[in-house]
Amino acid sequence: RAGLGALELPYLACADFGRLPLAASSMDLLWSNLALHWHPQPHRVMREWARVLRADGLLMFSAFGPDTFAELRAAYVKAGLVPTVLPFVDLHDYGDMMVEAGFADPVMDMEKLNITYSSSDELLADVRSFGGNPFVERKAGLTGRAAFGALKRALDEQKAADGRISLSVEVVY
């Protein structure tokens, strides 16, 4: 076959990061975008990534850092609620995990983004779009109207002079 049809398709795997269905030293490149922070044991993932990468392989990943959603955490506390935001890992801790897993001289960086919203409803809808709640010990049942209203009021109190609510996102690379 000629043209694009002659290209091999990439191997895609859907699996637990910590138990990849791949042979040791079988990958030239591992790419993970904004997913690592969902795994409860990122140190285990780093060991697994080191196992499947070839000696000269490249690991590229991004994950949310600990300053992500700081304003939302503060609003939860102000509303008298227990925050249901993941405890994101610091970039230095990721670097340490990489060294412990056998990676040589990892290069880490981070970037802080500031997203603004016109309303607390818009902000909360965006946060919900990031996925579910992985906390095993979270409160059973739904958040009541009064508690949800208190959270929205606490977010609305954070509005800047332009009437917008900020939400910080720290991306670790």
Predicted regions mapped to residue ranges:
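Short conserved AdoMet
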Residues: 5, 40, 54, 103
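A short SAM/SAH-binding and catalytic strip from SAM-dependent methyltransferases
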Residues: 28-43, 63
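A short glycine-rich, Lys/Arg-flanked "PGG" loop and its adjoining helix->strand segment in the class I
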Residues: 43-58
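Short, glycine-/aromatic-enriched active-site segment of Class I SAM-dependent methyltransferases
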Residues: 66-85, 92-111, 128-129
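Conserved Class I S-adenosyl-L-methionine
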Residues: 104-173
